[in-house]
């Protein structure tokens, strides 16, 4: 389990849960801190059968661990929502820890209004053909929709790095218009990196996922969110 935190101090305590407010937030004039929890079976999972690191993380992923993190977040941010991202393996793993986590996350979606989505493991665009990345994103979205039920559908993808073609596919084929698709500060470390990009949200160009669109002719209607943004 990997949690991406910015600006929060989490304390274990009984959560104080207010009624979930599902009204859309106004972007203009506001600032936001996002918290995402990634559920995976190994580091740097690119696909079911493409894993860049062999370590099995099942013992790191427990119901007790994710519950403590979610409840600490609720205690300190009673109206806050967060995003859960599952790798394909984490969506399908039949072991007890992952089954319990999936069931709990479905409860959190109903209780808090959390986003539940696909996390294709940081580096899919570097190790898989773009068509396969697109196909597996659609497959994962369908799995998640069935898992959560009640017509639920993810509104974002937690990508790590996704190509411009992948972002265009999300916008045009899946009607998803937000993706974490770049880590601007990461270059030539871990299992891959990028060439740099703006460190704040932007609409990408069809030419490259790190390039902001220059006009209508190269505009992709999927906001590219940097994963490691810092002021």
Region roles according to the model:
Residues 20-21, 156-231:
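Active-site-adjacent pocket scaffolds in enzyme catalytic domains
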Residues 1-7:
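Bacterial N-terminal signal peptides
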Residues 38, 121, 182-184:
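Histidine-centered beta-alpha loop that forms part of the nucleotide-sugar donor binding/catalytic region
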Residues 43-45, 91-94, 124-128, 163-168, ...:
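Short catalytic/ligand-binding loop motif for oxyanion handling, primarily in non-cytosolic enzymes
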Residues 79-162, 224, 229-231:
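Metal-dependent polysaccharide deacetylase catalytic core of the NodB/CE4 family, i.e.
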Residues 64-68, 135, 139, 143, ...:
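Extracytoplasmic/secreted proteins, especially bacterial periplasmic and envelope-associated proteins
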Residues 15-106:
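Active-site beta->alpha N-cap acidic-glycine motif
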